[in-house]
Amino acid sequence: MLYPLKFHPILKKKIWGGERLAYKSEEHEESIGESWEISAVEDNISVVSNGILADNDLQELIEVYMGDLVGDHIYEKFGIEFPLLIKYIDANDDLSIQVHPDDETAKERHNAYGKTEMWYIVDAEKDASLVLGFNHEIDKATYLQALHQNKLMDLLNVQKVKKGESFFIPAGLVHAIGKGCLIAEIQQTSDITYRIYDYNRKDANGNTRELHTDLATDVINYSYQPQHRVNYTPQDNQSAKLVKCPYFTTNLLVFDRDI
């Protein structure tokens, strides 16, 4: 018999990771940038932490319970591959400027799903910001010139953010999470990221991280899209719709007391 399932978090140390997710680590590790709460990404399958199904992974459960667990429509379409990845992101420093491919390109290049996602700002320090696309419409040549001249930041749309805001990040949108943001992210099951700019920073071993300039160029949406913030009005004990897209629908439920 099914019951409310809990999963062990899958923790990811990052060069930009902070301390706000350290409580999820038994060793209280530092620089944890991501905590994957529910994942079906290959080699990162979530494992149940509670009840009689503890120690079973997500794919094993779907194989047994099928539509009873994920719904008949989802099971018929995806089989045992759970279609969403849900995580927390703690940015103690700016994340790289990046972009994700859509389904068609991801299938062709990586035999994988694309990556459309949404963010909910769990917390944000003063002056925390996000990069959300370009600040005006450009073309590929303009983008490449700015990239090669180390002037990409001049083209990017940087928006200040605050706790409780939500944003939709479709595949093809150049984006980045800024320093001081703690974010809940819901996305397609995909770990494909094309890193296009990383501030020329180096890791603990003095190495710069790999960039994916050639892969990214043909998936970027170069148009000007000013509105990525989700408009919603939260009300106590009522559900507010945040994002509805072909891959997921998200709702926010705010309670007026602890539960």
Place the predicted regions along the sequence by residue.
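Active-site glycine-rich loop that binds ribose-phosphate moieties when present
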Residues: 138-168
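Gly/lys/ser-thr-rich phosphate-binding loops in alpha/beta enzymes
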Residues: 5-17, 156-165, 173
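Fe(II)/2-oxoglutarate
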Residues: 153-156, 181-259
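Transition-metal
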Residues: 1-138, 198-226, 241, 250
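Tight coil/turn sites that cap or link beta-strands
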Residues: 102, 170-172, 180, 256-258
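Surface-exposed loop/turn positions
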Residues: 93, 165, 257-259
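Short, well-ordered, mixed-charge alpha-helical segments that flank or form enzyme active sites
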Residues: 105-106, 127-132, 138-143, 169-170, ...
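Conserved metal-binding segment of the jelly-roll/cupin
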Residues: 97, 160-179, 186-188
